[in-house]
């Protein structure tokens, strides 16, 4: 009798994706982040669903409803902080996943990579709208500042902003539609993740060496299921430690003040995972230029496959490219730090230099270094 997992229409999809999938024998723990992102998404959808049962998307009651969740709902505080810190874990895994793709040349799988970039945009949009929902001071200011950026679009800008707001300022209509979008987007992300996986399984996984692993494959189960479970346990350990010991560490104290249009907080800043892009936005003294730089800071990922000039796929055997890669990582950490600082003397110039370095590394220095390495290796 043939095994049901290989014949049943539904089971055979699961079987070919997670059980009998031929995987390279040498993929390291950097390949764990795909499954961790899946776990993060499931955690976010489940906790979000339970939060939505108690949340009200009305400007008069939104802040109170979040307080009610934390005070009166059984384990509401736990659900709320799992959701808030789960978003941080989601972005940590995302950044590491993208960094892995850059380092090992996974971007050569064009369809998989482009859907990944689309997923990154979708997750960022979802996180931004989620931050608006508690209707604290920083929620309100963030919504106003970020939506206002669209007014930099020539001719249609101001009309577009009012259309998104549903009025002449960020108000009840804005909050209601943000809640609707915040609810639906994770399901779109889940569908996109399925397509992401579909395209990945067309080619098979990359591996640290960047060479073809067709001659040396092992089944996904039990080898990588066990390996992924270890990663998931570590993720849950870090997330629960964060939630139970310092749930507000990554948040902003201003968001515990109800939104007040008449009172502006001294420093408006987004959540930590947007600070690098926010620093790039602020480093350009022109509104339209800043908005373009902000979008390009993420969109630049889509053109990375076109900038691949090396004859080797991975950076594993390319020490000069490795140096530039880690310089890029350091630069992104610097930008994240600058994004959280006030706009005054030393920080402005540091932010501008870090922004220039960010684009220079990706668009100019890394492709040139790859060409140089080709010559050094007589390729």
UniProtKB/Swiss-Prot annotation:
Q: Which organism is it from?
A: Episoriculus macrurus (Long-tailed mountain shrew)
Q: How does it sit in the membrane?
A: Multi-pass membrane protein
> What is one process in the GO biological process aspect for this record?
mitochondrial electron transport, ubiquinol to cytochrome c
Q: How is the cofactor bound?
A: Binds 2 heme b groups non-covalently.
Provide the transmembrane region boundaries. 33-53, 77-98, 113-133, 178-198, 226-246, 288-308, 320-340, 347-367
Provide the protein name. Answer: Cytochrome b
A GO cellular-component term linked to this record: respiratory chain complex III
Q: Where in the cell is it found?
A: Mitochondrion inner membrane
Q: Which family does it belong to?
A: Belongs to the cytochrome b family.
Assembly and partners are described as: The cytochrome bc1 complex contains 11 subunits: 3 respiratory subunits (MT-CYB, CYC1 and UQCRFS1), 2 core proteins (UQCRC1 and UQCRC2) and 6 low-molecular weight proteins (UQCRH/QCR6, UQCRB/QCR7, UQCRQ/QCR8, UQCR10/QCR9, UQCR11/QCR10 and a cleavage product of UQCRFS1). This cytochrome bc1 complex then forms a dimer.
